[in-house]
Amino acid sequence: MQKVIVVTGLSGAGKSTVSKALEDLGYVVVDNVPVDLLHNLLELYEAKNQEQLVAVVVDSRSLRHQGEVSKFVADLKDLKNRMPLDVIFLEASTDTLLSRFNLTRHLHPLVHATGSRIALIEAIEREKELMSELRDVSDVVLDTTGMKERDLVYQVENFIGKDRGPEFYLISFSYQRGLPTNADMIYDARVFQNPYYVDELRTLTGLDDSVAEYVRADHNYGRFLDLWVELAERSYNEHIKMGKPYLVIGVGCTGGQHRSVLVVRDLSDQLTKNGHKVITWHRELGSVN
């Protein structure tokens, strides 16, 4: 087969959106695959069509116990040695998942998993614990908290694109709204002077030149940026040695509007100049580049 994508993660985190995106990219998508049949299914497609793009969705509907998850992880490692296979793991904050389930009125797959009905929040937390082993071996972990559907599609398209995948994911965020759960490292942009307290800059963002000029005028800005670029590249090199193909860096400030956005912007420019492929996501602004 040309390529296999395994889509997994938490219920309500966006697997349906990713499945539709993969179909649009020419993948045959098989949903809710029984894990015991995964080997046979992929072997069938491999024998039938060497050029077929295949995506399978596997989640807690078919992984109900820790033993099943552990066996599935072992199966994935075996399959990776035999065919080109990547695992995409989707997650979101508990509050986000609660909101999505309450909006759609769908029943969480673990609500009845123990034979008796449990609260939705308990089902979500149980699933996070259950799927943690699978999360740890995934090729990419996408946190869809606050992410619009088109932004998720964009990130998936970039990950599975024909060119090499991104080496850095840079996320600007507000500390008031929580840290991005998939970040490998956090940079704190609150050390710089805050444009929020300048009336003519308050409603602007770190994408505006006037805000950039103000923040860059901080005597610490250039030194911190140079150090952060060096740290990012050194950390990425160590991640590569551990078999991890990319590094996720979160950059936070108070509101996620000014300083963190600019730092992500400048980090991206410098890392790109240094030959790296970078994806940026300004979480509080709802934009991906």
From Swiss-Prot:
Keywords on record: ATP-binding, GTP-binding, Nucleotide-binding
Protein residues bound to ATP: G9, L10, S11, G12, A13, G14, K15, S16
GO molecular function, a single term: GTP binding
InterPro entries assigned: P-loop_NTPase (IPR027417), RapZ-like (IPR005337), RapZ-like_N (IPR053930), RapZ_C (IPR053931)
Keyword Membrane: no
UniProt: GTP binding residues: D59, S60, R61, S62
Alphabetical list of Pfam families matching this protein: PapZ_C, RapZ-like_N
Family label: Belongs to the RapZ-like family.
Reported function: Displays ATPase and GTPase activities.
Name the record gives this protein: Nucleotide-binding protein COPRO5265_0725
